[in-house]
A protein has these predicted regions:
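Cys/His-clustered metal-coordination modules, chiefly Zn-binding fingers
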Residues: 197-293
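Interaction interfaces in information-processing and related assembly proteins
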Residues: 1-229
Length: 293
């Protein structure tokens, strides 16, 4: 089954909901970045959140970036998503290894440590929207719940999870975001809160064979759930040789000349997908001619 996101509403428009299965894109990220199990779990959770938050945006060219920077050994995570289901991301220190936490789970909170969550939305305005909150647990889902409440004034429930196989490949990954819209009744709020208390972990639901549709039906079935959209999602990077060359031209003649003088092929690396682009001395000379300063 390929990865996808379900967009839905419930309770006559008082609740909006998103649920996703992201096993393949998380496994793609694991292979691209050679992430350790705890880094895979952290990055997979944020990629899952990023792709769901990306499809919340309306414009075809809208871009969402989520950054987490902490004092833990992983350093941080960056994820970028568009409104069409494409997402990419990386961990600052992908090889970090940590013992399990006290619950015997991968210690994402310990890997990230104390820090800050930033959400940047570039939606075609003069300045991008930037919302910033502290990390409350550093487990990512609770931090995003706190972000939605404080920065977007939207009461939300966020669940994110990554389950690993014994060989450290990804067994399951996915999540949901449920949001109460303005005017939601007290009855809807209390019923939803009680229903959410019954939910086991998102990964155990996925591992039991539940699809995103079934998970939303399980939580919101009594609220006249209406599924609006099924959106494919994938890890997709838009890096290219042309972009790398533009970046090199932009650094200026002095730096380019220094690279040429070293007389070696250089390797340019894309942070997001870890692809390397070799650039020869002859190619650098060609770029030097195009540089304006």
């Amino acid at each position: 089954m390929s990865d996808y996101i379900i967009r839905a509403t419930a309770a006559e428009g008082q609740i909006r909901a998103f649920a996703a299965t992201t096993k393949e894109l998380t496994e793609f990220a694991r292979q691209a970045h050679n992430t350790s199990p705890v880094a895979t779990a952290a990055l997979g959770r944020l990629l899952t959140a990023g792709t769901m938050m990306g499809v919340m945006m309306k414009g075809a060219d809208d871009i969402l970036t989520i950054k987490i920077e902490g004092d833990g050994p992983i350093g941080g995570l960056t994820v970028t998503a568009d409104s069409k289901g494409d997402v990419k991301g990386y961990a600052y220190n992908p090889e970090v290894m940590l013992p399990p936490n006290e619950k015997g789970k991968l210690d994402v909170g310990g890997a990230l440590g104390i820090g800050v969550l930033s959400v940047i939305k570039d939606i075609g305005l003069k300045e991008p929207y930037v919302g910033q909150t502290i990390l409350v647990t550093s487990e990512i889902a609770e931090d995003l719940t706190y972000y939605f409440a404080t920065s977007e004034q939207t009461p939300s429930s966020v669940a994110l999870g990554v389950l690993m196989n014994k060989d450290n490949t990804v067994r399951q990954a996915g999540g949901f975001i449920l949001q109460l819209l303005p005017g939601a009744s007290e009855e809807v709020i209390s019923t939803l809160e009680n229903r959410l208390k019954e939910i086991t972990s998102i990964t155990s639901l996925l591992d039991a064979g539940n699809t995103p549709e079934m998970i939303l039906e399980h939580i919101l079935g009594d609220f006249d759930l209406e599924i609006l959209d099924k959106i494919p999602t994938q890890f997709a990077c838009n890096c290219s040789r042309e972009r790398i060359e533009k970046a090199l031209i932009s650094i200026g003649k002095k730096e380019l000349q220094e690279m040429i003088d070293e007389g070696k092929t250089i390797e340019m690396n894309c942070h997001f997908c870890n692809k390397n682009y070799p650039v020869t001395v002859e190619e650098l000379k060609g770029l030097l001619e195009k540089a304006v300063r």
